[in-house]
């Protein structure tokens, strides 16, 4: 039965006392280390089931970690609810904002909201924090992941030099740009020196980004930021996130990805500053909402399973989506191409899952082309078809092996079908399964349409009326055959005697006159007949029946 939340929270202090009595001396030492709420929260959320411990011991350990985090003996019910609401609010934030807000250690949901809203007015703080993460990720991450969040702790202030990130400066416009010189405080000089001593790998990857031709968008001073209108601020915000994506990929934080040869050139003007960017990575787009969200873990802190990019459009997981934060502050998400819109040619390729190989639009197979390779569905000879279309690999240029696609096949008789629904319906003929049974004569039918037609024989309903004579019919097929009498239409013409027929069945029977085909054979004497009615009459002679007495 459901338990009231207030009652459940009211039981926490008593359970905590019962568990405290079982704590050992080693648990007391552990409790001192878990004094930080953030550390206790991470231990609780990252706790995994231990097979060796068993379910009872695992539940006991999980309860202890929950008490360490929520502290029911100290916090009230309202405070515990506030902690849970704050955690959930931080979890649903976009990844870049989430990491920054967590580092500020907000004490309530209102404080977290204030921090998020402050980023819209001054994104420079988030930009500088991102720069610190990229430049000193190996060294500074240890300090940023310290178990306790002290009130007086201030992160070092860094301004990023574009040359050090392997990105070229853009030409400055009317609004003079701030020079991005790395200003280090005394307590971070040694740390960044150590980070630079690893170099080669980091610096080599950063210099390689010079091919992108991207320039770091500078952090505008407050007076310059206030002069921008809403559109320019949104452009500034998007370009900042785009540059952040290049920094992250250049610093080796994002997961590896196959090389893309397509290049998109675009220029944007912001506050008199012209930025010309050459990208080797396509800008985030989505095609008809069919492209699923790509998830990327930047590993900037040890939070488990952080989904950093919640935007609906991603470009193969390399660059964080420009709309990941823009969509958070605004209602629309630009960059999505709907139906009927022209997509850039660089984004027309279909990428195979897990291989990074691409297919050109010409290699997509339409249903019509696919049907030309399908075997006869009722031949029973073939259940696997091979498509002869070969797709070439983007890197090696070697043709792939032909792609096999299995068709639904009946295990009883071996018939092959195009769709699973056809196979399921066919299997009823073997099992004798019937879905629709007449309540009057108890006759059963497989199809609902046949069942409806049969019911009309009992009710006398004839909903299909002839427009010429007003005669009624129970179904449309009978009406169509009748209308051909009025129109004189005889679509089935014998190629031998040129006699025409209204119905196909009559045409087929007539053809047996010319071909001499006799498909109906008597099981007693072996005599064959062209029509089933002739066979019925003949069989009565063997049985000695006289139908007319």
Curated annotation (Swiss-Prot):
Keywords of this entry: DNA-binding, Metal-binding, Nucleus, Repeat, Transcription, Transcription regulation, Zinc, Zinc-finger
InterPro entries in the record: KRAB, KRAB_dom_sf, SCAN_dom, SCAN_sf, Znf_C2H2_sf, Znf_C2H2_type
Every KRAB domain range: 211-283
Sample GO molecular function, one term: RNA polymerase II cis-regulatory region sequence-specific DNA binding
Any Gene Ontology CC annotation: nucleus
Highest taxon listed in the record's lineage: Eukaryota
A Pfam family matched in the record: KRAB
Disulfide bond sites: none
Annotated signal sequence range: none
Family: Belongs to the krueppel C2H2-type zinc-finger protein family.
Function, in words: May be involved in transcriptional regulation.
Protein name: Zinc finger protein 18
Organism whose genome encodes this protein: Homo sapiens
Gene it is expressed from: ZNF18
């Amino acid at each position: 039965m459901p338990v009231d939340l207030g009652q459940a929270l009211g039981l926490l202090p008593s359970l905590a006392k019962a568990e405290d009595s079982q704590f050992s001396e080693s648990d007391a030492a552990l409790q001192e280390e878990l004094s930080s709420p953030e550390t206790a929260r991470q231990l609780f959320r990252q706790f995994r089931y231990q097979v060796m411990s068993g379910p009872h011991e695992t539940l006991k350990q999980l309860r202890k970690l929950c008490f360490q985090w929520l502290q029911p003996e100290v916090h009230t019910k309202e405070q515990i609810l506030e902690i849970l609401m704050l955690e959930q609010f931080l979890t649903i934030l976009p990844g870049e904002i989430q990491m920054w807000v967590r580092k500020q250690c907000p004490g309530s949901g209102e404080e977290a909201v204030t921090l998020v809203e402050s980023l819209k007015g001054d994104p420079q703080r988030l930009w500088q924090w991102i720069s610190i993460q990229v430049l000193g990720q190996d060294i500074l991450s240890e300090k940023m992941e310290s178990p306790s969040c002290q009130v007086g702790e201030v992160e070092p202030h860094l301004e990023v030099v574009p040359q050090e990130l392997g990105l070229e400066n853009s030409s400055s416009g009317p609004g003079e740009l701030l020079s991005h010189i790395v200003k280090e405080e005394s307590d971070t000089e040694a740390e960044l020196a150590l980070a630079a001593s690893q170099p080669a790998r980091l610096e080599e990857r950063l210099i390689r980004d010079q091919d992108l031709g991207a320039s770091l968008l500078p952090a505008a001073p407050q007076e310059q930021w206030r002069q921008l209108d809403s559109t320019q601020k949104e452009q500034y915000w998007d370009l900042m996130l785009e540059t952040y994506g290049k920094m992250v990929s250049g610093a080796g934080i994002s997961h590896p990805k196959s090389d893309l040869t397509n290049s998109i050139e675009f220029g944007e003007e912001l506050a008199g500053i012209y930025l010309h960017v050459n990208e080797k990575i396509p800008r985030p787009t989505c095609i008809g909402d069919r492209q699923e969200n790509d998830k990327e873990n930047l590993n900037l802190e040890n939070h488990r399973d952080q989904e950093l990019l919640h935007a609906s459009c991603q470009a193969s997981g390399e660059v964080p989506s420009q709309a990941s934060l823009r969509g958070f502050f605004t209602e629309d998400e630009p960059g999505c191409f709907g139906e009927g819109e022209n997509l850039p040619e660089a984004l027309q390729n279909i990428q195979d899952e897990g291989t990074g190989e691409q297919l050109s639009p010409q290699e997509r197979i339409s249903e019509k082309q696919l049907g030309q390779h399908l075997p006869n569905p009722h031949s029973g000879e073939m259940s696997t078809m091979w498509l002869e279309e070969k797709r070439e690999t983007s890197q090696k240029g070697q043709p792939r092996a032909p792609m096999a696609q299995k068709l639904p096949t009946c295990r009883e008789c071996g018939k092959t079908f195009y769709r699973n629904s056809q196979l399921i319906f066919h299997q009823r003929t073997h099992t004798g399964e019937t879905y629709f049974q007449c309540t009057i004569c108890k006759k059963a039918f497989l199809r609902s349409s046949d069942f409806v037609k049969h019911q009309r024989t009992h009710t006398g309903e004839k909903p299909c009326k002839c427009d010429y004579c007003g005669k009624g019919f129970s179904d449309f097929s009978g009406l169509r055959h009748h209308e051909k009498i009025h129109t004189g239409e005889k679509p089935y013409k014998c190629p031998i005697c040129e006699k025409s027929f209204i119905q196909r069945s009559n045409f087929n029977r007539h053809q047996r006159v010319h071909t001499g085909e006799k498909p109906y054979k008597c099981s007693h004497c072996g005599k064959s007949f062209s029509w089933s009615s002739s066979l019925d009459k003949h069989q009565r002679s063997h049985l000695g029946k006289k139908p007319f007495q």
